[in-house]
């Protein structure tokens, strides 16, 4: 996956975000994507190869691994980051459309602006108001939903956030209940708890930003003359 391309796109959104939104993007890339790319892949790189069961029955080890780890932590984290980042891309599309319309009207002479050329329009910071306010606020709301949903999926799918050292499996074609051992359970538990904690921090930042936008919206409404 091209995380650099995603950073470039979201970096464009970052120019029009609130201060809280800028902090969220920093946390997203430094504490989640960088950890996922640099460290987590090393920890989970050997997960299936080093998943050992005390049986020689063909297929038993693979079935047991699939039963306890239906989706790799790495892939689920990557999927989570995609879902969490997608709403921000909607904001980028909205800003791009806004600038396109403004450039079109500028070229046709339909609007009078303080800008001398199109390049200045491209560099303009778009204020979070009007229809963009709804797009931006909606993107934050869906980020919170996706973060919470994936945290719940993690907890249910893996029966908690701690990685077990020993799991017992009696799925077919295992001849009986076999013991299977997970490699690096403590290290994987630490990484899992860290990623979940960062998800919680991101939810807190998103809720704080959402409250800030709602308060600013309501205060703006109250200042308008009746």
Swiss-Prot record:
Q: Does the keyword Methyltransferase apply?
A: no
Disulphide-bonded residues: 53-180, 60-174, 64-169
Spans traversing the lipid bilayer: 21-40, 76-98, 132-154, 193-215
A Gene Ontology cellular component where this protein is annotated is: connexin complex
User: Which Gene3D superfamilies does UniProt cross-reference here?
Assistant: Gap junction channel protein cysteine-rich domain
> What SMART domains does the record point to?
CNX (SM00037), Connexin_CCC (SM01089)
One GO process term, biological-process aspect? gap junction-mediated intercellular transport
Q: Which UniProt keywords apply?
A: Cell junction, Cell membrane, Disulfide bond, Gap junction, Hearing, Membrane, Transmembrane, Transmembrane helix
Q: Which residues lie on this side of the membrane: Cytoplasmic?
A: 1-20, 99-131, 216-226
Glycoprotein as a keyword of this entry, yes or no, is: no
Q: Which membrane topology describes this protein? A: Multi-pass membrane protein
User: What GO molecular functions are on record for this protein?
Assistant: calcium ion binding; gap junction channel activity; gap junction channel activity involved in cell communication by electrical coupling; identical protein binding
PANTHER family from the entry? CONNEXIN, GAP JUNCTION BETA-2 PROTEIN
Question: Whom does it interact with, and what assembly results?
Answer: A connexon is composed of a hexamer of connexins. Interacts with CNST.
Q: What is known about what this protein does?
A: One gap junction consists of a cluster of closely packed pairs of transmembrane channels, the connexons, through which materials of low MW diffuse from one cell to a neighboring cell.
Q: Which family does it belong to?
A: Belongs to the connexin family.
According to UniProt, the name of this protein is Gap junction beta-2 protein
Question: What lineage does the source organism belong to?
Answer: Eukaryota, Metazoa, Chordata, Craniata, Vertebrata
């Amino acid at each position: 996956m091209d995380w650099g391309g995603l950073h470039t796109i979201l970096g464009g959104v970052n120019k029009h975000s609130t201060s809280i939104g800028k902090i969220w993007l920093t946390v997203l890339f430094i504490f989640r994507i960088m950890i996922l790319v640099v460290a987590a892949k090393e920890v989970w790189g050997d997960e299936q190869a080093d998943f050992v069961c005390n049986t020689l029955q063909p297929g038993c080890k693979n079935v047991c691994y699939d039963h306890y780890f239906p989706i790799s932590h790495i892939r689920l984290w990557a999927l989570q980051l995609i879902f969490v980042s997608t709403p921000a891309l909607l904001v980028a599309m909205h800003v791009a459309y806004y600038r396109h319309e403004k450039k079109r009207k500028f070229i046709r002479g339909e609007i009078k602006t303080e800008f001398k050329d199109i390049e200045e329009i491209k560099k303009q910071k778009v204020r979070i108001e009007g229809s963009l306010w709804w797009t931006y606020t909606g993107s934050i709301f869906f980020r919170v939903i996706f973060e919470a949903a994936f945290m719940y999926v993690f907890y249910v799918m893996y029966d908690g956030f701690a990685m077990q050292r020993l799991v017992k499996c009696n799925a077919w074609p295992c001849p009986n209940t076999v013991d299977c051992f997970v490699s690096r359970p403590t290290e994987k538990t630490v990484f899992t708890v860290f990623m979940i904690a960062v998800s919680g921090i991101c939810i807190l930042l998103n809720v704080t930003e959402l409250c800030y936008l709602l308060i600013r919206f309501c205060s703006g409404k109250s200042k308008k003359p009746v």
